[in-house]
């Protein structure tokens, strides 16, 4: 059986891994997943990530904790295969009044809501992370 929403699966693996106090989670890799992992690392939500394997690449995320608690409080899928959510640059959301990030897929690549506002770009809202 094929996976219907690989991004939702990635976010669920992160959520479940942190709930179980895992040090790392692994999943099948894709360019979009690597771009999201790179953003999460830049914003300080995960320690690190790496892609292993040539024929079937696997993405491994090293989860981050602060004083024994997960750094990621909430991670929520917004745009999904059955209902895509697009916003113009003026309508981009602020997650937790700027404390979290919205991951946006734009014509210039995957970026945070802050970077998209600065670049004057709108796009598909992939997920919220706080």
UniProtKB/Swiss-Prot annotation:
Function in brief: One of the primary rRNA binding proteins, it binds directly to 16S rRNA central domain where it helps coordinate assembly of the platform of the 30S subunit.
UniProt record similarity statement: Belongs to the universal ribosomal protein uS8 family.
Name listed for the protein in its UniProt record: Small ribosomal subunit protein uS8
GO CC annotation terms, alphabetical: ribonucleoprotein complex; ribosome
Keywords: Ribonucleoprotein, Ribosomal protein, RNA-binding, rRNA-binding
Species of origin: Sodalis glossinidius (strain morsitans)
NCBIfam families (UniProt xref): PRK00136.1
Record-linked SUPFAM superfamilies: Ribosomal protein S8
Gene Ontology molecular-function annotations: rRNA binding; structural constituent of ribosome
HAMAP family from the UniProt entry: Ribosomal_uS8_B
UniProt record, GO biological process: translation
UniProt xrefs under InterPro entries: Ribosomal_uS8, Ribosomal_uS8_CS, Ribosomal_uS8_sf
Origin superkingdom: Bacteria
One Pfam family per UniProt: Ribosomal_S8
Annotated gene: rpsH
Subunit structure, interactors included: Part of the 30S ribosomal subunit. Contacts proteins S5 and S12.
């Amino acid at each position: 059986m094929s996976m219907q929403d690989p991004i939702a699966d990635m976010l669920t693996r992160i959520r479940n891994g942190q709930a179980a106090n895992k040090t790392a989670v692994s999943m099948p890799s894709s360019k979009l997943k690597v771009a999201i992992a790179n953003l999460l690392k830049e914003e300080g939500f995960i320690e690190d990530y790496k892609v292993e394997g040539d024929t079937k690449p696997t993405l491994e995320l090293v989860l981050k904790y602060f004083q024994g608690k997960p750094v990621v409080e909430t991670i929520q899928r917004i745009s999904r295969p059955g209902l895509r959510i697009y916003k113009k640059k003026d309508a981009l959301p602020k997650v937790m009044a700027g404390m979290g990030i919205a991951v946006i897929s734009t014509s210039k690549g995957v970026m945070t809501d802050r970077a998209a506002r600065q670049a004057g770009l709108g796009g598909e809202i992939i997920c919220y992370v706080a």
